[in-house]
Swiss-Prot record:
Subcellular location: Cytoplasm
PANTHER family, per the entry: PEPTIDYL-TRNA HYDROLASE
Residues with site note (Stabilizes the basic form of H active site to accept a proton): D91
Species of provenance: Rhizobium johnstonii (strain DSM 114642 / LMG 32736 / 3841)
A GO molecular-function annotation: peptidyl-tRNA hydrolase activity
Protein name per its UniProtKB record: Peptidyl-tRNA hydrolase
Taxonomic lineage from the root: Bacteria, Pseudomonadati, Pseudomonadota, Alphaproteobacteria, Hyphomicrobiales
Binding annotation for tRNA: Y14, F64, N66, N112
Cytoplasm is among the record's keywords: yes
Disordered: annotated span: 190-243
Enzyme class: hydrolase
Biased composition (Polar residues): 208-221
Entry's family note: Belongs to the PTH family.
Biased composition (Basic and acidic residues): 190-205
Gene3D superfamilies: Peptidyl-tRNA hydrolase
Length: 243
């Protein structure tokens, strides 16, 4: 069994927050792959199903972000699972909007949900980070993270979540680089192996002190579907606020 845990905060007040993109991701997988209805166990909303022929448990901890590890750790102990049997999906300030990175282990980078998972689940689990961008000023981080996605964010958020859900079998089969390429291409970028060597070399020279500052970039926005489950969900989310 594989646990795919999306991190976020429970309740309608937080549903549209950037910090809740992990919840949005597992919701997308849930809809796309015919999981059981959501139920409550392990202080979480859980759903069982299969992806790519493998048994998967989706989790949305209801403990609030800072205690996510207590919920996920309880489920792992119940099913006698190891860190390798866990994938955590969460928001990442230090990635531009619409970018994704997937790796095993690593640090928490100040993310309280990941701090909690590290404490209760071990550190060698897979981490799927979904970029929400950085506001550029440290004092603005909290409002940015706990603020709702803007309507304009639909241009990258919908294809990101759609592509992740469509290719969740790659996530289950540990085909990490293939999944990252699918997401990059869906967002109008290039597959990882297609990056010029000079670009990779230059990227490695970027000072660590600048990691929180991202310059605005112009990308060709992908054409979005007007209908479908993801479109309906995002219309409801963005429709809560005026233009």
């Amino acid at each position: 069994m594989l646990i795919i845990a999306g991190l976020g905060n429970p309740g309608g007040k937080y549903a549209g927050n950037r910090h809740n993109i992990g919840f949005m991701a597992v919701d997308a997988i849930h809809r796309r792959h015919g999981f059981s209805p959501w139920s409550k166990k392990f202080r979480a909303e859980i759903a069982e199903g299969e992806v790519g022929g493998e048994k998967v448990l989706l989790m949305k901890p209801q403990t609030f972000m800072n205690l996510s590890g207590e919920s996920v750790g309880e489920a792992m102990r119940f099913y006698k699972l190891q860190p390798a049997d866990l994938v955590a999906i969460y928001d990442e300030l230090d990635l531009p909007q619409g970018k994704a990175r997937l790796k095993t282990g690593g640090g928490h980078n100040g993310h309280n949900g990941i701090k909690s998972l590290d404490a209760h689940c071990g550190r060698e689990y897979r981490r799927l980070r979904l970029g929400i961008g950085h506001p550029g000023i440290k004092d603005m981080v909290q409002n940015h993270v706990l603020g709702d996605f803007a309507k304009a964010d639909k241009a990258w958020l919908e294809p990101l979540l759609d592509t992740l859900a469509d290719n969740a079998d790659m996530l289950v089969r540990n085909e990490d680089s293939q999944l990252m390429n699918k997401i990059a291409l869906a967002l109008g970028g290039k597959a990882e192996e297609e990056k010029p060597a000079k670009e990779m070399k230059d990227a490695g020279k970027k000072p660590a002190s600048q990691s929180h500052i991202h310059q605005a970039r112009n990308h060709n926005q992908p054409k979005l579907p007007a209908t479908g489950p993801m479109a309906d969900m995002l219309k409801k989310m963005f429709g809560k606020k005026g233009d």
